[in-house]
Structure formats: C-alpha cells, structure tokens
From Swiss-Prot:
Pfam families: 1-cysPrx_C (PF10417), AhpC-TSA (PF00578). InterPro entries: AhpC/TSA, Peroxiredoxin, Peroxiredoxin_C, Thioredoxin-like_sf, Thioredoxin_domain. The keyword Oxidoreductase applies. The lineage of its organism: Eukaryota, Viridiplantae, Streptophyta, Embryophyta, Tracheophyta. It comes from Spinacia oleracea (Spinach). Belongs to the peroxiredoxin family. AhpC/Prx1 subfamily. Its EC number is 1.11.1.24. GO terms for cellular component: chloroplast. This is 2-Cys peroxiredoxin BAS1, chloroplastic.
Length: 265
C-alpha cells in the first residue's frame, strides 16, 4: 500500500500521566508481569500479533481498504467544526474551521501520511495553484494524522528529496484522529485517513465531497472546476450541466427554459 501506518499496543494507566516504575517485588503488578512471562501467555500474544501482521501485509499489496461505515457528513449539512494545530510558513499556528464562516470557501482535504508517495504530488499541486483558489476567495487546508513536528520536517525537506518545500496553505495535525472521524474518512484499524475532499461554502455548509481510496490521487483541475461551478450556481436561476467550465453555456432549472440549452448542443 502506498500509505500504511503500523500500530503498537501499549499497556498504560487510564490517566494520561506517566508514573515511574516501582522496584518493589511486592507490587500488585508483579503477578500480571508473571502472567505475561508465562509460556502460554507469550505464545498467545505472539500468535495474535502474527495474524494482525499478515492482514496488514495483504492490505499493503492491495492498495485498497474497506472503511467502516460511520455517519458521514452529508452534502447540504453543516461541516463539523474543529480547532487544531497546523504548520504554515514553517511556524506552528492554530486553525479553526468556523473562523472562515462568512468570509471564505474552504477546500478541506485529507491524506493518509507524511513522507509517503502519492500524498506529496497532491499537496504540492494544490500549493502551486493556490493563487487561483485565492482569486475565488477560497482557502485550502490539508489534514493528516501526523504531528505538527512531522509536518514541519516534511515542509523543510525539498521536493527533489521527496519533501514538500514551502507550502502556500496550512497542514493541519489530527493526531487525535477526531477530525478524520468526524468527516467519516478514518480507517479505524490503520488509524489513517482516506483521501477525502470537501468543499465548504461561506455559510459553513458542505457543498461537495469526494473520497478516494489510498492509491488514487486527486485532480486539482476537477476540484477547481467544481468550485467554480458551485460559486456560479449561487445564482438560483442557473445550474451547470456535466463538465461545465466558466464561459460555457449554463442551464435554466425550468422544464421549458432548459430547452434553450438542449436545442443549442
């Protein structure tokens, strides 16, 4: 698979704090440790891990996964709000989705992992076209489950070495996976996101969404065309036929008036 995250099972206390290990052999945890060190217990752990590993290898080769069915944020509904850390201009910043309401359209796209293969081709393509999105009063936001430190390291790596170089928009860190989950793109057993893309209007409403599997990159041209069509149809008297681009003939959403369009094609 082009982008795969490995996982390690941790034994921890319910608290997020880390406590120093106790050296006393009378500690209640000793019996638990003895259980783990017994031949039958360790064999069970090994066999369980082997089964998970074999499934992971199969997924890597297939370049495709089956996501769990969550409640997806549907087109026409409000986009789930979030606030998260991000990297922009080689600095750590805060990004809150609702800050764009009433101001800008937002293209929010998810990608699986930093330092992978398909992902940088998409991320840099959106960056190279950022000025065109700015002219359409639109902000671009990229999201993955990586930390801001990973984002920063990737941005500081030049493109010829598989890095991103400087970007013209923020990369958001979703280490808690809460954003990916709320937008219905999280692959639960791998802890990474599918290639989801959402166009959100100035009222904070999702107007367009696409979700690609891991091995398939997205088209900036098609995203741009869709955004232009969405903004054009802000006029309630016009709709856009298939493949419509700015300057081409649109259609009236009326049984009689639409005949003018069909008679001209």
């Amino acid at each position: 698979m082009a982008c795969v995250a490995s996982s390690t099972t941790l034994i921890s206390s319910p608290s997020s704090r880390v406590f120093p290990a106790k050296s006393s052999l009378s500690s209640p945890s000793v019996s638990f440790l003895r259980t783990l060190s017994s031949p039958s217990a360790s064999a069970s752990l090994r066999s369980g891990f082997a089964r998970r590993s074999s499934l992971s290898s199969t997924s890597r080769r297939s370049f495709a996964v089956k996501a769990q069915a969550d409640d997806l944020p549907l087109v026409g509904n409000k986009a789930p709000d979030f606030e998260a850390e991000a990297v922009f201009d080689q600095e750590f910043i805060k990004v809150k989705l609702s800050d764009y309401i009433g101001k800008k359209y937002v293209i929010l796209f998810f990608y699986p992992l930093d330092f992978t293969f398909v992902c940088p081709t998409e991320i840099t393509a959106f960056s190279d076209r950022h000025s065109e999105f700015e002219k359409l009063n639109t902000e671009v936001l990229g999201v993955s489950v990586d930390s801001v430190f990973s984002h920063l390291a990737w941005v500081q790596t030049d493109r010829k070495s598989g890095g991103l170089g400087d970007l013209n928009y923020p990369l958001i860190s979703d280490v808690t996976k809460s954003i990916s989950k709320s937008f219905g793109v999280l692959i639960h057993d791998q802890g990474i996101a599918l290639r989801g893309l959402f166009i959100i209007d100035k009222e904070g409403v999702i107007q367009h969404s696409t979700i690609n599997n891991l091995g398939i990159g997205r088209s900036v041209d098609e995203t741009m065309r869709t955004l232009q069509a969405l903004q054009y149809t802000g006029n309630p008297d016009e709709v856009c036929p298939a493949g419509w681009k700015p300057g081409e003939k649109s259609m009236k959403p009326d049984p009689k008036l639409s005949k003018e369009y069909f008679s001209a094609i």
